[in-house]
From Swiss-Prot:
Phylogenetic placement of the source organism: Eukaryota, Fungi, Dikarya, Ascomycota, Pezizomycotina
Family assignment from sequence similarity: Belongs to the SED1 family.
Recorded GO CC terms: fungal-type cell wall
Protein name: Clock-controlled protein 6
GO molecular function: structural constituent of cell wall
An example Gene Ontology biological process: fungal-type cell wall organization
Gene coding for it: ccg-6
Taxonomic source organism: Neurospora crassa (strain ATCC 24698 / 74-OR23-1A / CBS 708.71 / DSM 1257 / FGSC 987)
Induction comment: Expression levels may be influenced by circadian rhythms.
InterPro entries assigned: Sed1/Spi1 (IPR038843)
PANTHER family on file: CELL WALL PROTEIN SED1
């Protein structure tokens, strides 16, 4: 009984982690797609055969196109201090022969870089799945 309750809980949590996708539906007068190789596409009862790489336009519409809305979060820090790369060799002066002053030393400046956050949602989903697995294991052992 404990195992079946844990299995149901794990399945529900897994389904919930992937069910928060929002879709948008649009009715268009034509659909254009790129086919990289030979294929067959069935749309609205019609079959379109592509024999080589081509751009295919389906114009016997209205056609309903449903797409997921994908959101991406990113962080850009404009006030962060830059990272000084210590592997850049220090600028040197060749010196001059004769009179005059030595050339000015140029110090390289480094601009701040963007913080990569691509895939953070996937990591969050996987950590939730890991937590469900640990809870399931605890339920089995109890």
């Amino acid at each position: 009984m404990k195992f079946s309750a844990a299995a149901v809980l794990a399945a529900a949590a897994g389904a919930h982690a992937w069910s928060n996708v929002t879709y948008t539906t649009e009715i268009v007068t034509a659909v254009t797609t790129y086919c990289p190789g030979p294929t067959e596409i069935t749309h609205g009862g019609n079959t379109y055969t592509v024999t080589e790489a081509t751009t295919l336009t389906i114009s016997d519409c209205p056609c309903t196109v449903t797409k997921p809305i994908i959101t991406t979060s990113s962080v850009i820090c404009h006030s962060c201090t830059g990272y000084v790369n210590s592997t850049i060799p220090a600028p040197t002066s060749a010196g001059s022969v004769g009179t005059g002053s030595a050339p000015a030393v140029v110090t390289p400046t480094v601009s701040p870089s963007e913080v990569p956050t691509a895939g953070a949602g996937k990591a969050a989903a996987l950590s939730g799945a890991g937590l469900v697995g640990v809870l399931g294991l605890a339920a089995i052992l109890l």
